[in-house]
Amino acid sequence: VTQEAVNVRKEERGYNKALLWNHEQQGMDKLTDTIFFDKSLSLFAFEFGQADDGRDIGEDIQTRMWPSLAIAVPVFIIGMLANITFAMLMVFFRASYLDLSGVILCVVLMSISGLFYLIGGQFLAGKIMQLVPLSGYAQGLDAFKFVILPVFIGIVSGIGSGSRWYRTLFLEEVSKDYVRTARAKGLSEIRVLFVHVLKNAMIPILTGAVVVLPTLFMGSLILESFFGIPGLGSYTIDAIQAQDFAIVRSMVFLGSVLYIVGLVLTDISYTLVDPRVRLDG
């Protein structure tokens, strides 16, 4: 592609202007005749504009967010519960062969490529056993047979790293004084772990949960593209491949907003799980 062709494409799409401040203009045009003012300022009012094919991006987001949520929410909730439970079991049997076996299993699961889970799961469940469709999506209850395999793969692929991280958090807590005090009062080990240790480990758990908040809305880029699910993840991938900057810009902005909202919600949730934390400082 020649530089001339690049310049023509930029001019056609309005990207030949200055980014934030146009020195070539006079007065307020220095500020308004910029890419930021023309393309990005409207995003703060959640006006996403139109894609290159003329489709309304806001309507596409409203339509595509539900398939993304159908995958991301179960993966997040079930995956977190599975990781915490598995980590608690390893901590319960800590310094034993069961704990060592669990750690080895976590390392093995972490070492396997994500693409292997996708290809292997699709090949076994979809092609060999023919339990679920290989790809596609449907509305209503029919969507269950299309999302169950991506959800399962999303959960299994994250168990290794998630459980190992939670195990580290819980092991750090079990050596503290309040745990020894709880045991001295005659509480069972199960109650100590799932009531006292888990409660005091909630702050780092909540902090880690913030990172995945944008994916709850925007979906998984690889999962949706691989299984042909019309969610926001595949929407973003298609936009990148088509060089549709309007869609890419909108999705990046949306992800940033969700991340900031997640940080605020996390700070609020700290006050719920730990009475020592106060928002007023």
Identify the function of each model-found stretch.
Residues 23-80, 84:
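An internal, D/E-rich "acidic patch" concept
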Residues 31, 35, 39, 56, ...:
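Amphipathic alpha-helical recognition patches that constitute DNA-binding helices
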